[in-house]
Amino acid sequence: MTEPSTDCPFVELMEREYYLDDTKVLVEFPPHHRRILNKAFRANEEGKLPYETVVWSTPKKEGKTAIGGAIAYGWCRHYGGNAFSLANDKDQAGERMFDRVVKNLQIMREKNESLYLQIVDEGYHDRITKNNMIEFAEGDQINPSPHWLKFVPADYAGEAGGRQAFTCFDEMWAYKGDAMSRFWDEFVPLSIMPASLRFITTYAGWYGESELLWSIYDTVVKPDPHDPHIKHGTPVPELEDLPVYQYGAAYQPGSYLVYWDHENRMPWKTPAYIEGRRDDPAVKGRESEWRRMWKNEWTTGQEAFLPAELIDELMDMAESKGLVNHMKHW
């Protein structure tokens, strides 16, 4: 006998309807993804989501764009309202998360045409996108219609004053300068909507350049200088074994859930594969960029005189010889 699902309706819907573009099969989330998604999207008895902003930051090739696409699709189906795929430029806004949603619908049209005709607005049956937008049919969505997903580059003035229910900021490490700050400010979650969320996918940025992302990291994730195991944010109940942190009280305005991982958890990403990326002649002399993309660590964009591993090895060797660092907490 099959045990009843413990997933929230939002996670169940994504696994029931969202096709991956590379394999053309329905998504099946890894256990750690499933736990985080259930925590982020399990509404309370009043139907309110626990967090206004969710950050999903992992090393390269950990499925960030696929997660963003599945969530954007699921949002339009379950919560509805106006949804935006946002990015640093037009190509990135249209070719990443938004493009995954389009490909999902193309695969759905082949594999489950009746569902496709049911959920996509009649005017979009033959052509999935029009004017950078996908329109979804009226169903049992929680937010008022119209229900659509639109991709928008960083032109905040063109979309000012909208009624956004959902926004996805893709690769936020690339958001730099005052214009990007104003763009961010325009797309805040709206309390007037029954459900409204801001979702961020990214890996780490550069010190002094990725100001928006650094502000979030510094507030929620950055380790205490005296104890690296202590973060500025608080561990999330039931997720204490994962690098997931909370800022603000759940179900309250301004609340954040931040998943900031340094591990390569996909089973195909063996240590040999990761080291192979490090030994690639094309990245020779750019150790910091390898660490940023494959370890999800903040860097300056400039190379250190000595690699961190060598420094650690020398410190251990010195300690074994009786040398003690009396200022290690300074």
Report the location of each language-model feature.
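Phosphate/NTP-binding elements of NTP-utilizing enzymes
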Residues: 1-330
